[in-house]
Amino acid sequence: MKFSAALVVAAMGAAPAAGLPTDINGDLPPRMYSNLSGLQSKYARGIMAQAKREHLGSQGCRAGIATALVESTLIMHANMAVPASLAYDFDRLGKDADSIGLFQQRASIYTNIKCSMDVACSAHQFFKEMKTVPQWKYMPVGKLCQEVQHSENPERYDEFINQATEICQAAGF
């Protein structure tokens, strides 16, 4: 199993965010967000940077962060059922069907495994689907997450809206 540098740093007790690369984070500086570990904060920055690149505003940011919190706890998941996912950096093995990455995107639907295992690319996949939802800019964020993900537990998204809002606001959304 591969571990990211952030997880190793966190396990050693150092301040993980300070040593993280910022290339996936656009113009967002390394920092910790609302009850997130350094590793989770790194992934949150990647999602938020993609939301900024796509000009999705607070609504897009909150939907992306809330979804990743629910689906993966903002931890990169590979899956033994998707052997190709094991070739990329991951932090945890998942076992939900053929779901991988931060958004638990189904490999049978999102066939570019490399993309699903990459923070910016997987966020783009999520946002691309999100933008097809009619009136996505105006609906409640939890409902928007459900419209994109089609979860068996749609109520879970609402549980993370406040945290997602705090994280996005701290990043300037």
Predicted features, each with a name:
Residues 68-72, 137-159:
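Acidic helix/loop microenvironments that form the catalytic cleft of cell-wall polysaccharide enzymes
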Residues 25-42, 46, 72-138, 150:
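Peptidoglycan-targeting cell-wall enzymes and recognition modules
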Residues 56:
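Cell wall/extracellular polymer interaction/catalysis modules
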Residues 20-42, 157-173:
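Intrinsically disordered, low-complexity
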Residues 1-22:
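Fungal secretory targeting signals
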Residues 41-48, 61-64, 102, 120-127, ...:
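Extracytoplasmic/secreted envelope proteins and their assembly/folding machinery
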Residues 48, 59-75, 148-149:
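Short, functionally critical alpha-helical segments immediately adjacent to catalytic or ligand/cofactor-binding
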